[in-house]
Amino acid sequence: MDHSALLPTDTREIIEANCREATDNGYACICITPATLTWVMDYLRKTAHTSNVSAAIGFPHGTTTAEVKAYEAAQSCRMGANEIDMVMNINRAKNTDWDYVREEIQLVRQAMAAERQDALLKVIVETSLLTQEEKIKACETCIAAKADYIKTSTGFSQGGATVQDIRLFAGLADKRIKIKASGGIKTARQFLDMIEAGAQRVGTKFSLQILEGLTREYGIK
């Protein structure tokens, strides 16, 4: 479970409450914006808690340049993030400029590695905006660029993760890339559906609600 706190209205108090939830429940990471990253790192130092921290870059539309995304990623890693969730350049993807998309991901990957070799890169492709052919090409491009994860959605567009898209990516992955389902996942049943379809991680801001549902409805703790 990747727990997200990405709203532009999130105050420091809200971010710290989300950090507390993430550390108390052992989530895979907390995903925040670079602007709130200092609050997260301060909280973790102050409480002596540990958590993986992911910064969302080029968020939410992916429309900044490759160089800006690379700088954002490098700066976030310097500030303490050990994971990056970057938004693919959807304009370029829709224009079939897949070389640009691949090179952008590679540039971000290199910028991250210069700061910390162990950082994970997740690429958000915003599946609701892509055709089936574009989804396939996006997955192939993420694999070619050596991303660690392909991620379905930002949660800020017109649609979110679907079981069909997770199955599509799982069929293409062949152990070369992992899959993160994100966007619109609110219930225990949705969470289980995504995992069963092939996702290794699920991104949501409804993490505690899902955990409670897993225990109440399925006896999973």
Feature map (PLM): residue ranges:
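Alpha/beta enzyme core
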Residues: 3-25, 35-179, 187-213, 220-221
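Metallocofactor- and cofactor-centric catalytic cores in central/energy metabolism, strongly enriched
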Residues: 28
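Short hydrophobic "strand-cap" motifs at the C-terminus of beta-strands
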Residues: 182
